[in-house]
Amino acid sequence: ACFTLHARKDERVREYISPERIVWTQEAERISHPEYLLREGNGQADLTNSHICVMKSSDTAHPAILLDFGKELHGGLQIVTGMPGDHSPVRIRVRFGESVSEAMAESGSKGVTNDHAVRDFEMTVPWLGVRETGNSGFRFVRIDLLDSNRELHLKEVRAISIYRDIPQRGSFSCSDERLNHIWATGARTVHLCMQDYLWDGIKRDRLVWMGDMHPEIMTISHVFGHTDVVQKSLDLARDITPLPNWMSGMYTYSLWWVVAQRDWYHFHGDMEYLKQDFRLDEEILELILRLIVEVMCSNRKMIRIASDDKPVEIVRSTFMK
């Protein structure tokens, strides 16, 4: 028998980042050498069991630590463990946060949720091994030792940054450092959203929203230039939303798709790509105009539209004289 393997190479890269500082600890006297976690790691467990951060719990005391990775990123967490006396897996709780307060928050409090990207969960880590987990937007991570009367040996805790490795072609600089910072933050935010598709946000909603995509497309065009993720995302919105359905459930978002097509061509001049969707652009506009005419006719009771009428001609001949 002949089998077809459906595989696709990830267009993004992975970068491992060690924490920059320890923000907070709980039961600090039960955590030895937390500073070892700030060392540059290699992602490999080994038999030396040296430079290990050890967290020890009791029946009533359960230590925890909050790490700062220095910048907002999209990705997950890599945990490399050592060799405690007990070989059984250790149960921990992991909390991601874009801020310290979010990483410290309980789910359900002050709007903190696990929607779209799970930011608060329990898991086990192995004896002398490596485990990778998480898929969210974050800067801070809190780790709690949940098991009682256990030791958690941490050789490394590193963030996994997942992003598209593309050059930044555009730049901005002025005498106002606050404006420079705002521009750089906007450029990085959009870069983080350029994942497998162009998302509206790296934590929530992680969806292709046409209304959000247009300002992102404008930013990408100015900062990064032509990149395939834009066309890939425009195509996805088109393919999953056949007419007469509206993209993302809103007619205005279908209109934003048409505007995005126009502006993408304006910046990059890719006529071959634009030609692929000429007909759909026309059909969306025809449908919108037909609805406009129907509303106007219903309100003013001036005309009726036959099935073979062209809405553009009706609008021009009847309401634009």
Where do the protein language model's features map onto the residues?
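The feature captures the catalytic groove of carbohydrate-active enzymes
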Residues: 105-116, 126-127, 240-256, 263-266, ...
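Aromatic- and histidine-enriched alpha-helix N-cap/loop-to-helix transition segments
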Residues: 136, 207-212, 225, 248-256, ...
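Extracellular/oxidizing-compartment recognition motifs
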Residues: 1-196, 211-212, 225-234, 272, ...
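Long, well-ordered core segments of solenoidal/helical folds
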Residues: 183, 187-197, 224-245, 277-296
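Well-ordered alpha-helical segments within folded domains of soluble proteins
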Residues: 210-221, 230, 251-263, 320-321
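Short linear capping/connector segments at secondary-structure termini
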Residues: 163, 201-203, 301-304
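Short coil/turn segments at secondary-structure boundaries
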Residues: 197-205, 248-249
